[in-house]
Amino acid sequence: TFEPDFVMLAQNEGFRLMTLVTRSTSQEHIDREFAWAKSQREDSPETVSFATTISMENWDDPDWQEVTISRLRQDFDSGASAVKVWKDIGMTFRDSDGSFIMIDNPRFDPILEYIASQHKPVIGHLGEPRNCWLPVDSMTVPGDSSYFANHPEYHMYLHPEYPSYDDQINARDNMLAKHPDLIFVGAHLGSLEWDIGELAQRLDRFPNMAVDIAARISHLQIQDRDTVREFIINYQDRLLYGTDAGVSESTESVEWIAERWHRDWLYFTTDSVLTSPEVRGPFEGLGLPVSVLRRIYYQNAQAWLGM
């Protein structure tokens, strides 16, 4: 966030924030974002945490792994509490032979082993919602239709030569199978937002995996209400509330954030019939127990992200 009013709003509403250094294009870009994230943490240490990321620059260099681990060591010493990996791994970067670099590539193994040894979590936005591989008019929620209409570079239906949805999920699963000690938080319901049964299978298979629900609550709202409620109660220690939102002059307003928090709260806490601009038609709130709300809104962020 570039807006101090956002931090003040979070403090007033009892929220904590995590700033995610995102995009692995160059170390220069990462350094710029890292410095800003660190300054936010220093300004509001009780409210703001931050995650670093890894640079894919010089991927083919023999010492890339060593340099990357050294940089992560510095970042952890400087206060980073997690590592973010973004969808550009698997959807943008290519190896010297032209193949896409997936997260289960063996060159990542020593880096992931180092992160696990430091007991730091990886926050992984790997792949996209399954809607990404569908035509815009076949997508299940308006938010996806709007996003991919405006970001054709990430609309995989238009790029059949890119890795498939299953390729993305399988690469993530392979990575987790290779690194069972790695603490992993799958961003956006782990890109399994379309079917909580599929997500439950992964949570059962990978005990060190949790997911945040940021920017994917609408996908819960279009699934069977009782099934979703049972899923959240059963996996209450593996789900983290989040919004995937930031405030600057060019993004959402503080008022928009406050409205989003309120709308989400009604969905999780009441059994009222609700509407949302992100869902076509009405849906019923979940009316979750207070003990479950305490976990997904607070305790799990402490346990999984050290917030």
List where the protein language model places each region.
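Hydrophobic faces of well-ordered beta-strands that scaffold small-molecule active sites
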Residues: 1, 17-20, 48-53, 83-85, ...
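Sec-exported extracytoplasmic/periplasmic mature domains
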Residues: 11-16, 77, 298-302, 306
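Conserved phosphate-coordination/catalytic loops
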Residues: 28-31, 62, 66, 102, ...
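Active-site gating/metal-coordination segments in enzymes
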Residues: 32-155, 207-210, 217, 225
